[in-house]
């Protein structure tokens, strides 16, 4: 819908219809919406999406996408030798486009699988470089989109890339979101089993954001459960959240599934998670996502510590001190 009185400019009928069409396009992508009223923000957003769309393929060819690594800190040792691979877009003009601005457009235009594979290849290349240099490396997790996961050749494609770079088993972890897990449980179980047989580790991301099912943990052979950051935000239900978190961790520990807490930002959260035997932590309290060279410097430092005398990270110790001071 486009109201004539809302337009500051004098338009011909074609221009008016053009703006109504902009509004119509937003209805197609919205949930439970039957109409939309045009305003300038709609046109700006659609023009922005079009500009992203027009340069997506070329940007992939030009390798404008950078892989960043967000370390995961082991709460027992305090070492950060594992990480999650994330993507950033640095245009040829030097502009950094955050993932929330381009990933939804890649998904909408069915190009997200190409981006997934691009990141996966970059991670494999990083691991191979370290192995060839005789440097230690630990598990790196990569995110897989719904579209990628349901590709008929998904497992074979990723296995072929893994084999091309000669990556040993268990150094690559495939992250799938909880929402994917509930689309088709039978297909999920089959695909996860295939991935495991090819030497991949499997993690469920964003656990707790959807209709989590305990049968999923019982029937699907996952290795890692990532507890969503929504459990750790300040809320009036903090005590109940902590009870739920402890229950989840107790359960999955008994199932030999490792736990990662996401979005951790305070010493109080670290102390609590250490007290309930969470395995790893990821969040700004320790590290933001880092470019490859900075992550590699951390790896080299952490492994040097590990080879001499393993010691807890200073921030883990700070969290333990927080516990002593507040109890």
What is each model feature region?
Residues 1-8, 12-30, 36-51, 55, ...:
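Cyclic nucleotide signaling catalytic output domains
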Residues 3-7, 45, 75-84, 110-188, ...:
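Catalytic core of bacterial c-di-GMP phosphodiesterases, primarily the EAL and HD-GYP domains
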Residues 4-66, 111-114, 124-125, 133, ...:
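Inter-domain helical "communication" segments and dimerization helices
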Residues 9, 13, 49-52, 116, ...:
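The cytosolic transmitter module of two-component sensor histidine kinases
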Residues 37-106, 143, 204, 261, ...:
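Active-site core of bacterial EAL-family cyclic-dinucleotide phosphodiesterase domains
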Residues 75-76, 92-93, 145-152, 171-186, ...:
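EAL-family c-di-GMP phosphodiesterase catalytic domain
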């Amino acid at each position: 819908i486009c109201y004539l009185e809302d337009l500051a400019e004098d338009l011909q009928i074609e221009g008016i219809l053009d703006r109504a069409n902009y509004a119509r396009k937003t209805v197609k992508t919205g949930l439970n919406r039957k109409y939309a009223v045009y305003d300038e923000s709609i046109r700006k957003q659609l023009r922005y999406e079009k500009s992203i769309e027009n340069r997506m393929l070329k940007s992939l060819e030009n390798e404008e996408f950078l892989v960043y690594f967000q370390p995961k800190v082991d709460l027992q040792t305090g070492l950060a030798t594992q990480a999650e691979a994330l993507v950033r877009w640095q245009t040829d003009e030097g502009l950094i486009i955050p993932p929330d601005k381009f990933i939804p457009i890649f998904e909408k235009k069915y190009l997200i699988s190409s981006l997934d594979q691009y990141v996966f290849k970059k991670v494999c290349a990083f691991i191979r470089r370290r192995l060839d240099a005789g440097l230690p490396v630990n598990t790196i997790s990569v995110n897989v989109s719904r579209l990628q996961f349901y590709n008929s050749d998904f497992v074979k494609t990723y296995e072929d890339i893994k084999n091309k770079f000669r990556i040993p088993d268990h150094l690559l972890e495939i992250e799938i979101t909880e929402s994917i897990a509930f689309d088709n449980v039978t297909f999920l179980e089959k695909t996860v089993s295939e991935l495991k047989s090819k030497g991949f580790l499997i993690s469920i991301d964003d656990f707790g954001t959807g209709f989590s099912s305990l049968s999923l943990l019982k029937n699907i052979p996952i290795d890692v459960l990532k507890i969503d950051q929504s459990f750790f935000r300040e809320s009036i239900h903090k005590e109940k959240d902590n009870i739920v978190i402890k229950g989840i961790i107790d359960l999955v520990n008994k199932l030999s599934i490792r736990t990662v807490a996401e979005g951790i930002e305070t010493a109080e959260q670290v102390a609590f998670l250490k007290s309930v035997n969470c395995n790893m932590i990821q969040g700004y309290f320790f590290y933001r996502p880092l470019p490859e060279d900075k992550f590699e410097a951390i790896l080299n430092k952490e492994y040097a510590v590990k080879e001499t005398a393993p010691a807890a990270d200073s921030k883990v110790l700070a969290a333990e001190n927080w516990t002593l001071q507040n109890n």
